[in-house]
């Protein structure tokens, strides 16, 4: 009987919010794996890209895409960037800044996103967040083949969740030297009921009805704050990074829930320094006003700060235990040099903020990396 209220909530949500239908039903052509995996000029000038076949997935053959721009001075330091939800790598300015700062720059478009999207796929769909590990591992392997010996793994939003999750689940086998996150999706921006009951319930039923779809709000505030044709500074493909986010599947909700939970439960296993960056301000609303240029309109930065501090505290306690020291006598809890940092008036994607604020984000990232390169 104790489970009855939860089941009733689930039934209500399933009936009112979700339309369970086959997300692949519109495509009737062949599902042919990519055959050309050689390097080719990228859509971004000065960059090159190549596809990586990732085998058969629940919806057919899938692929990821590695994008790179190499430092001409022969650097052996690399930065690998993982984009967020409803997103892809288009931030040429970011890659250029890393290259100009002495790094080889890499990015990955994950399966079903951007360059990696195939016509039989539903955009951004996922069953388990672990699926992305193969995409990231392929990029790391390429980075190693290119002769790099020091790798920083970075991620934004759901990409930030994924790289933190990867660090928590793989521990010492994560294959990188440090992790940088930009507004990582460590918690839903919902009220307590939605976070603790509704979202987990939808995720649970997502195992039975993975293709059920949940409509997103018809909000333009964040997209308008980014796009140059409206009020922002940036130009990108709105077929790949849509103004209005498409419905998400129930399986996607479940994958996010599980990744968030497992990341927090296993944070102590993150064996490399981690930087958690977030905005200093939360923006509420749906349609654009100038205030959208002054904070995070997608996630709650104060919740991200709380989750980031919890991750680092668990990580540090584990490191102290391994060092044979008593946790209660920690004088400097940042034994690995992990940090949580607020960027004043940063947008949800901090590196797309107005110049002064994204410069602060870059300064934070480069300072974090330099500190660990010197120690």
PLM regions with names:
Residues 23-73:
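N-terminal cap/lid segment of alpha/beta-hydrolase-fold proteins
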Residues 87-90, 95, 99-120:
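Conserved alpha/beta-hydrolase
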Residues 214-338:
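Serine-hydrolase catalytic core
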Residues 158, 162-250:
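Alpha/beta-hydrolase-fold enzymes
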Residues 85-86, 114-150, 356-361:
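Catalytic nucleophile-loop/oxyanion-hole region of alpha/beta-hydrolase
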Residues 76-84:
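Short beta-strand element of the alpha/beta-hydrolase
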Residues 317-375:
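Catalytic active-site module of serine/aspartate enzymes centered on a nucleophile-bearing elbow/loop
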Residues 1-22:
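Bacterial Sec-dependent N-terminal signal peptides
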């Amino acid at each position: 009987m104790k489970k009855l209220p939860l089941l009733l909530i689930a039934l209500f949500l399933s009936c009112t919010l979700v339309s369970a239908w086959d997300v692949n039903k519109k495509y009737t052509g062949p599902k042919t794996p990519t055959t050309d995996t050689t390097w080719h000029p990228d859509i971004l000038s000065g960059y090159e890209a190549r596809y990586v076949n990732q085998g058969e997935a629940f919806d057919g053959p899938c692929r990821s895409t590695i994008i790179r721009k190499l430092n001409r001075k022969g650097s052996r330091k690399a930065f690998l960037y993982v984009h967020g939800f409803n997103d892809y790598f288009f931030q040429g300015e970011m890659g250029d800044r890393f290259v100009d700062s002495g790094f080889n720059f890499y990015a990955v478009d994950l399966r079903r996103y951007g360059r990696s999207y195939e016509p039989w796929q539903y955009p951004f769909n996922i069953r388990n967040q672990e699926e992305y590990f193969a995409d990231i591992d392929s990029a790391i392997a390429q980075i190693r083949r290119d002769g790099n010996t020091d790798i920083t793994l970075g991620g934004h939003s759901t990409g930030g969740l994924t790289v933190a999750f990867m660090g928590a689940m793989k521990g010492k086998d994560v294959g990188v030297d440090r992790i940088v996150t930009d507004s990582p999706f460590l918690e839903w921006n919902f009220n307590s009921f939605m976070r603790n009951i509704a979202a987990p319930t939808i995720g649970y039923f997502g195992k039975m009805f993975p293709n059920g779809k949940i409509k997103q709000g018809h909000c333009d505030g964040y997209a308008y704050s980014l796009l140059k044709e409206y009020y922002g500074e940036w130009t990108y493909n709105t077929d790949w990074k849509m103004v209005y986010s498409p419905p998400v599947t129930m399986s996607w909700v479940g994958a996010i829930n599980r990744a968030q939970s497992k990341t927090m439960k296993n944070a102590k296993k993150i064996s490399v320094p981690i930087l958690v960056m977030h905005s200093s301000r939360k923006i509420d609303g749906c349609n654009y006003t100038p205030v959208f240029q002054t904070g995070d309109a997608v996630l709650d930065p104060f919740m991200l700060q709380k989750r980031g501090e919890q991750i680092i505290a668990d990580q540090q306690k584990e490191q102290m235990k391994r060092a044979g020291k008593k946790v209660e006598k920690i004088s400097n809890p940042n034994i690995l040099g992990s940090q949580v940092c607020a960027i004043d008036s940063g947008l949800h994607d901090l590196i797309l903020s107005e110049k002064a604020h994204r410069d602060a984000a870059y300064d934070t990232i480069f300072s974090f990396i330099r500190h660990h390169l010197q120690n």
